[in-house]
Design a protein with these regions (language model features):
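N-terminal, polar/charged subdomain of small-to-medium soluble alpha/beta proteins
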Residues: 1-133, 137
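Short "domain-exit" segments at the C-terminal end of structured domains
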Residues: 138-142
Length: 142
């Protein structure tokens, strides 16, 4: 995030989701555990002053949303899981201006000892300015 914009964070750590993502058919059929870490960039100041949840992002709702999204969709790549999940969180939670999202896959089919593999991304809203230039010309005279 840019310095001075939404430096407040709501963090979700190790959200466990059982879902069916993977390149191999057995991953899609059997499913496996995924762990999600998310940092939501937002302005918590109004909610903190007023002690009012309606002025903040309800992290319980975000956890439920991520879980349901990951369980209702099947993707081959955890890169896709991360991209689509981040997009949907930004679309559904208007006070979230950006997020860091990590999808961990500790049961990945790797025939070597390992702790986990993961994809971590950062996505945020950007202001866009659209300039419309209309060129009106007079008819040419012969």
């Amino acid at each position: 995030m840019k310095k001075g914009t939404y430096e407040d964070q709501i963090r979700i750590e190790e959200l466990e989701v059982y879902a069916h993502h993977g390149v191999y058919p057995e991953e899609n059929e059997k499913g496996q555990h995924f762990y999600v870490n998310a940092t939501l960039y937002t302005n918590t100041h109004p909610a903190g002053l007023a002690d009012d949840l309606s002025l903040s992002t309800n992290y319980g709702e975000v956890c439920q949303f991520i879980t349901e999204f990951m369980q209702q969709h099947t993707f081959q790549l955890i890169e896709t899981v991360a991209e689509r999940t981040a997009y949907e969180v930004l679309q559904h939670f208007p006070l979230v201006q950006g997020l860091d999202l990590e999808i961990r896959k500790p049961e990945a089919p790797i025939p070597l000892p390992f702790g986990s593999v993961s994809v971590a991304i950062h996505r945020e809203w950007h202001e866009a300015y659209i300039l419309s230039l209309i060129h009106i010309s007079e008819p040419t005279r012969p």
